Regions:
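Anion-binding and metal-coordination hotspots
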Residues: 1-194
Length: 194
């Protein structure tokens, strides 16, 4: 990956999908891709596969049809293809379409449905401007960001110790497993204390 010193380092990009309720890592992968644009779909599929393997049922409507599972991703993951594929998989993607500049006036909330002739990007921007979209996307910083903060700051894991993508991937899986064990242990001790 290109680094700020204008050179290239062999670096890895750690990815994770986290549940909103307990900050349990549901899926984790490592890639050597410099950006996240092509990572949302494989991560979404891995999360669904892991939920299915764990026997966790997807939410259903009263008539038994599967409800889309909301998920939020930052602007680095946005592509029209990703939005469409995630929706086809049974997810309800909320992906930022770009960055808001500092000191920029907030965008007015969206009212009603997006125009039918709007592009995927325009529909996503409209969705994120709705009250529900804003609330869901704002929760993202309380769901995924603390997980990476806990791993990097609280546990001091700032770099991988192994080399080679297969070994680094195994190391990342172990880091995520220990994170999940700590979360489960804390949930269990809170339940016992109650």
């Amino acid at each position: 990956m290109k680094q700020s010193n204008k050179g290239f380092d062999h670096s890895y990009n750690a990815q994770a999908v986290v549940d909103a309720e307990n900050q349990i890592i549901v899926a984790a992968e490592v890639t050597d891709a410099a950006n996240d644009k092509r990572q949302g779909v494989p991560l979404g599929q891995a999360a669904l596969d892991n939920l299915d393997a764990a026997g966790i049922e997807r939410p259903q409507a009263a008539d038994g049809t599967l409800l889309p599972i909301p998920n939020t991703l930052d602007s680095g993951y946005f592509s029209e293809e990703a939005v469409e594929k995630l929706a086809d998989m049974g997810l309800d993607p909320h992906i930022a379409t770009g960055r808001q500049k500092h000191n920029q006036a907030p965008v007015a909330p969206a009212a009603g449905a997006a125009p039918t002739e709007a592009s995927v990007k325009e529909k996503m921007a409209h969705k994120l401007r709705s009250a529900a979209g804003k609330a869901l996307y704002a929760a993202r910083k309380h769901i995924i960001e603390p997980v990476f903060g806990q791993i990097k700051s609280a546990r001091g894991i700032r770099a991988f110790l192994l080399r080679g993508q297969e070994k680094v991937s195994a190391e990342w899986q172990l880091i995520c497993l220990t994170h999940n064990l700590l979360k489960v242990w804390r949930c269990a001790t809170r339940a016992v204390a109650s």
